Amino acid sequence: MIDFTNCPVNRFRAYGGANGNKINITYQGHSYMLKFPPKPSRNRDMSYSNGCISEYVACHIFEMLGFRTQETLLGNYTDSRGKTKLVVACRDFTEGGKRLIEFAHLKNTCINSEQNGYGKELSSILEAIEEQSIYPSDELWQFFWDMFIADAFLGNFDRHNGNWGFLVDEEKQQAELAPVYDCGSCLYPQLDLERMKNVLQDEAEIDQRIYTFPTSSIEEGGKKISYFDY
């Protein structure tokens, strides 16, 4: 297990998102976002959720499925209070001057859309895929549905317009799909070992996780899409 405690911290790089604290470190000459485990919102018996493990495992599964995916490393970090936590390091894929543009930001440029960039309605997302002009729409459409299928396989309940996108070089006027990232909501991160065991021993619990939940964060008619229905 890698110990990231003594890695140099870049205090001038900060990150958004509500899923755990994050800092920027340098490890073996490269920039990484270090993600800390968030407190679970549902399972009060857990000190921290398994989001870091989910991030690491899900990203590697995406990679095995043929997706270009962010590089992730599991490790630990001891804070100033002496508390050691399991963390995941996500390599900065904007090294080299490219800029990440979330799909939400690109969708905001589609002035014919009825919703803003973070609008979750499937029809609005597909319209934006057709209307945007920085990437071939047929390839983007294919990527969107491939990612949707992989997210369904991994039980990702939080893939939204703000956690996938493009790497852009404005000077060269070029865009490419960003590696898949932000997979910490896959693989039921708030299930502890005992509850995992209970699910695996109960066919009704397994069926619920196939047919009922998790749902996609994308909506149709204002209702979250059932992965099974697609």
What is each PLM-predicted segment?
Residues 143-183:
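Active-site acidic catalytic loop and adjacent metal/ATP-binding pocket
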Residues 63, 167-230:
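C-terminal catalytic region of ATP-dependent kinase domains
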Residues 89-149, 171:
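ATP-dependent phospho-/nucleotidyl transfer catalytic cores
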Residues 38, 76, 92-94, 148, ...:
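Short, flexible loop/turn elements at secondary-structure junctions
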Residues 2-4, 38-39, 46, 130, ...:
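Residue-level signal for well-ordered alpha-helical segments
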Residues 1-113:
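Conserved ATP-binding subdomain of kinase catalytic cores across diverse folds
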